[in-house]
Amino acid sequence: MRNISPLRYRWSFPVKFFFYLLTLATLLAPIPFIFFKPGVPDKVTGSLIQVNDFKTYPVNGDLYITSILVTNPDSPVFGAETIVNWAIGANVVLPRDAVYPPVKPAQVIQRDSRSEMETSKITSTAAALRYLGYDFIELYFISDIRDYSNAKEKFKVGDFIKEIDGKVIGEIEEIRSSYAEKDIGDPLLIAVDRENAKGELERITDEIILVENQEVVNEDGSKRPAIGILVGATARFPIDIDFNIRGVGGPSAGLIFAVGIIEKLTEEDLLRGRKVAGTGTITPSGQVGAIGGIEEKMIGASRIGATVFIAPRENCPDIKNIPAGLKVIPVSTLAEAIVALRAPDSFKPRSCPNS
């Protein structure tokens, strides 16, 4: 029986050089991925929330909004850094389309993020003041109209949305729910108030047709109807409140903004010397909504020494790895968050099933 040695191929220099170039090109080529990692939390109980010409109370403790650092939508990500980040776990690596709408231009994404933050300041103030029993007037206006929307032919940026299909709009979520059960191609009657040349408001009512949402699809991949309008919020509040924050976008600071306002406007000591962090969107009525990057935000909170983390209950399926020493309190409303903060340290809140 003979031993047969395997054949050994010797690649010529041109072939080797070609594969070297191919490998190098792959590592240096931009690819459609993004990184995100925990951001540094911002302290709300310092000068971030400023109450003007109204009595405030000393704050005993620290309250933080949390954030994530995400690759900008127009920033290139290269193959080599993607492989390294994935291998060592320095950052979470995700396909770009998992975070940013694939058809939305980078400048629109960034503008929308800033608009969401501005709206969050209004809705959090509304939620906090409503919780404290103050009355005020809320207004919702068109802040942008998408090119794919036929509303562009009938309405203008700055129009105040007053009615949809004959129903008076009292809260921003009523705008979204007004067409949630409708289909693409269905009509929608919208009434707005528009300021004329004399500075007077005129009521304008017109019909639009629901179009396919070109930025978001349903979880099952089916197409979602849209009016193609971005809505901003403003209000005439009895208390003047400013937010001194830059470089943070999106709506996820709303819940903690609202808690911070309540902490400053009331004598009650909710923080009791603790470091409390959290996240969550909020509606003017105090409903708390889910956000992205919850685990990265918990890590950021843990790094600055927070012992309590307030999170949206809707995010419970995403809360799996809780940092040591961090008590996570899931809530559905602002009122639940306040009740949880009032409770003694020995109190064990109803936790997420999988945490």
Set out the residue ranges of the language-model regions.
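PDZ-domain C-terminal substructure recognizer with occasional recognition of PDZ-binding tails
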Residues: 177-223, 320-355
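Terminal peptide-recognition signature
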Residues: 129, 151, 158-161, 165, ...
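Hydrophobic membrane-insertion alpha-helices, especially the h-region
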Residues: 15-33
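PDZ/PDZ-like peptide-tail recognition elements
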Residues: 40-73, 93-146, 214-238, 242-247, ...
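Short, glycine/polar-rich helix-capping loops at beta-to-alpha or helix-loop-helix junctions
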Residues: 310-321
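N-terminal Lys/Arg-rich, disordered targeting/topogenic segments
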Residues: 1-12
